[in-house]
């Protein structure tokens, strides 16, 4: 069938083929793809809802992120009431200060009018973006949110193929694209999405899979920032990769 598992399988095969090509050429994939830069702005994905985790614990987590070198951090919203989540945003901004970028991710939790309410209340906290406010297929609702707030809207982790991203762009439903090459069709399709984004003056901030996406976002001129998960999110994740990515002064460097 279309999309779903089929496209994810294609993604895995395509990624493996690019890995083989890099090994044969004795070059890192980011250089095979153009090698625009060897370091990328990076944010730590954090601020998850957890049992027993209140505002005090959230504040401590943000402090830890900054101490380990983060210049940008992201937290979850959408599981609590709008006012409760605004309080979470406020606490994070107070802890990290004004020089650290702050993003929020709703994981499709809101209806469009709820997302607009949240965004308007959150604007004073200078958010770098508001991620996935509504269901992935609600291009019309998301476009209305985009028009209703000064906060850039980011989305795309649940989108498949360049045609899905084309539809999102044509609806003016997004300001920052978040493709995931493990989902949308692999490295080859990811690069086509990046070219499409560039032709529409949009930046790329890939979703997850930092060990893969460091190569892709390093290869393009419109790569905005890389998502980075600490070991506390999944202690086993970093152990399956030969090259551990280290966050330093807000950047991650592409491995050679």
Located regions from the model:
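Short glycine/serine- and small hydrophobic-enriched flexible loop segments
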Residues: 19-23, 195-198, 215-218
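Catalytic-loop motifs flanking and including active-site residues across diverse enzymes
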Residues: 9, 14-17, 189, 208-212
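Residues that form or immediately flank small-molecule/cofactor binding pockets and catalytic motifs
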Residues: 34, 47, 158, 209, ...
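Flexible C-terminal active-site loop/helix
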Residues: 205-256
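N-terminal capping/lid subdomain adjacent to the active-site entrance of alpha/beta enzymes
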Residues: 1-102, 107-109, 113-124, 237-256
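Catalytic core of soluble alpha/beta enzymes
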Residues: 75-207
């Amino acid at each position: 069938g279309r999309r779903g598992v089929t496209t994810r399988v294609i993604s895995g095969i395509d990624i493996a083929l690019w890995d083989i090509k890099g090994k044969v050429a004795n070059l890192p994939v980011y250089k095979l793809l153009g090698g625009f830069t060897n370091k990328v702005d990076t944010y730590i994905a954090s601020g998850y809802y957890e049992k027993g985790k209140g505002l005090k614990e959230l504040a401590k987590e943000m402090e830890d992120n900054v101490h380990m070198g983060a210049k940008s951090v992201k937290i979850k919203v959408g599981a609590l009431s709008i006012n409760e989540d605004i309080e979470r945003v406020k606490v994070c901004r107070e802890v990290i200060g004004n020089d650290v970028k702050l993003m929020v991710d709703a994981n499709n939790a809101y209806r469009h009018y709820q997302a607009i309410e949240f965004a308007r209340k959150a604007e004073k906290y200078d958010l770098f973006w508001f991620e996935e406010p509504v269901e992935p297929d609600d291009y019309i609702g998301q476009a209305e949110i985009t028009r209703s707030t000064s906060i850039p809207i980011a989305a795309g982790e649940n989108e498949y193929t360049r045609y899905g991203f084309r539809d999102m762009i044509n609806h003016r439903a997004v300001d920052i694209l978040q493709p995931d090459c493990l989902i949308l069709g692999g490295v080859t399709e990811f690069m086509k999405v990046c070219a499409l984004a560039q032709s529409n003056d949009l930046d790329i901030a890939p979703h997850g899979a930092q060990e893969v996406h460091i190569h892709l976002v390093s290869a393009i001129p419109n790569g905005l920032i890389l998502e980075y998960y600490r070991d506390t999110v999944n202690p086993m994740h970093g152990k399956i990769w030969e090259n551990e990515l280290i966050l330093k002064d807000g950047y991650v460097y592409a491995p050679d």
